[in-house]
């Protein structure tokens, strides 16, 4: 006789536990990055994602890194990154941009992940125009 007992239900956790992380809008010049006037809202981020703030990706310059327009990008605040990492940077203390960073002795290249766009290259003294605000650690994408 065949055993027809139901199998036990697997222990599934459908939604990971989360914590609230500030979403930054435009970053004001000269203010601490997490100052109240820079915070647009808060995102619920899974606890396993370690980040200090989020940004919303605007545009299609990072699509080959699978980061699309409207995605939430999780950023760990740090002033330096390794060459080849994706980071949020401020150029001329203006709006933040997300690019792959290539560091050289005499220049910095901010590289998009889309062949339709050209890298932004800063040589010599112009390298001081670029301020790394943090490393992209994760992104949260919506189903399209």
Positions of predicted regions on the chain:
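Short, positionally conserved secondary-structure boundary motifs
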Residues: 1-68, 96, 103-107, 129-130, ...
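Structural motif
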Residues: 70-72, 85
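Hydrophobic beta-strand signal
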Residues: 74-75, 88
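Short acidic low-complexity segments
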Residues: 75-82
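Short, compositionally biased
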Residues: 83-98, 102-107
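Short, solvent-exposed secondary-structure boundary/capping segments
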Residues: 108-113
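Flexible, small-/acidic-enriched active-site or ligand-binding loops
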Residues: 114-123
